[in-house]
């Protein structure tokens, strides 16, 4: 039985993760955490998600549960994730990271930690989105050098980072396939009078509105035609199930930094 702990348990993703773990054979939810001072501290996680009590209450202290779990699943914020990462590193725990919005220092900290512990770090845990990454690589090989490429993403109004980590990953997959650097090719803002678009640019557009779970569309545009590769998520359970799948896969891995390409064996396609 693989023992799971969840941080950010009271959030939208956290609640879906609790349900996903409970629905998955071979997994046992052993601990759930929220930030210090949260009104949810002491709440039974079963009652939190509308099922029967599970006898597991939300805590603020990981140290109290060190011996209780094998893999930590984290969908919080970068500053919190890096603290949880330090805990996992100090206690030889594996971690699935779904947090996005890290700066270069944060990404480097994750990379360094992976030299000692096993980590799955992905911008999106949807199976469909990760399949889209592969499709984008195929499209970029055929059309990327002569088409204009634009990435449009939409999320709920509470999402704080933009563009989404998934949109950036899409751009990175395309740029890498073309032998280019996204840092120099990306255009994140267009306003007012500006120079004519350059073919090497990869444009990003962001929408934040209502309760949109997550939508991404990539356009490859040439004179007279446009190819669109799109993905729409209608439930966060899609991401939760993917993260749980990643935790199961991670249980059999030594130290190292992995993503959903590894988990789903997409390189074999």
UniProtKB/Swiss-Prot annotation:
Active site: 155, 159
Catalytically driven reaction(s): (S)-2,3,4,5-tetrahydrodipicolinate + NAD(+) + H2O = (2S,4S)-4-hydroxy-2,3,4,5-tetrahydrodipicolinate + NADH + H(+); (S)-2,3,4,5-tetrahydrodipicolinate + NADP(+) + H2O = (2S,4S)-4-hydroxy-2,3,4,5-tetrahydrodipicolinate + NADPH + H(+)
Matching CDD domains: DHDPR_N
Residues that hold NADP(+) according to the record: 35
Pfam families referenced in this protein's UniProt entry, alphabetically: DapB_C, DapB_N
Gene: dapB
A biological process term (GO) from this entry: diaminopimelate biosynthetic process
Chief location: cytoplasm
EC number: 1.17.1.8
Gene Ontology molecular function terms on file: 4-hydroxy-tetrahydrodipicolinate reductase; NAD binding; NADP binding; oxidoreductase activity, acting on CH or CH2 groups, NAD or NADP as acceptor
Family of the protein in this entry: Belongs to the DapB family.
Protein name: 4-hydroxy-tetrahydrodipicolinate reductase
PROSITE patterns xref list: DAPB (PS01298)
Gene Ontology cellular component list: cytosol
PANTHER family, sorted: 4-HYDROXY-TETRAHYDRODIPICOLINATE REDUCTASE 1, CHLOROPLASTIC-RELATED (PTHR20836:SF0), DIHYDRODIPICOLINATE REDUCTASE (PTHR20836)
Job of this protein: Catalyzes the conversion of 4-hydroxy-tetrahydrodipicolinate (HTPA) to tetrahydrodipicolinate.
Organism domain of life: Bacteria
């Amino acid at each position: 039985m693989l023992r799971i702990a969840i941080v950010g348990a009271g959030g939208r993703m956290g609640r879906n993760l609790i349900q996903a773990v409970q629905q998955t054979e071979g997994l046992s939810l052993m601990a759930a955490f929220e930030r210090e001072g949260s009104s949810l501290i002491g709440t039974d996680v079963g009652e939190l998600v509308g099922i029967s009590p599970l006898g597991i209450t939300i805590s603020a202290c990981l140290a109290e549960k060190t011996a209780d779990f094998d893999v930590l699943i984290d969908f919080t914020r970068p500053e919190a994730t890096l603290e949880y990462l330090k805990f996992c590193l100090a206690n030889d725990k594996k971690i699935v990271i779904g947090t996005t919005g890290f700066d270069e220092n944060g990404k480097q900290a994750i990379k360094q930690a992976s030299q000692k512990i096993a980590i799955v770090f992905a911008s999106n845990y949807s199976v469909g989105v990760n399949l889209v990454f592969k499709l984008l690589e195929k499209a970029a090989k055929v059309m990327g050098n002569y088409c204009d490429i634009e990435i449009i993403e939409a999320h709920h109004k509470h999402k704080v980072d933009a563009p989404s980590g998934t949109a950036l990953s899409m751009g990175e997959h395309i740029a890498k396939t073309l032998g280019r650097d996204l840092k120099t090719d990306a255009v994140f803002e267009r306003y007012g009078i500006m120079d004519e678009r350059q073919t090497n640019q990869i444009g990003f557009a962001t929408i934040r509105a209502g309760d949109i779970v997550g939508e991404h569309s990539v356009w490859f545009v040439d004179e007279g035609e446009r190819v669109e590769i799109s993905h729409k998520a209608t439930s966060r359970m899609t991401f939760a199930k993917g993260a749980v799948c990643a935790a199961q896969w991670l249980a059999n891995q030594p130290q190292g930094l992995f993503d959903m390409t590894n988990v789903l064996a997409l390189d074999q396609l």
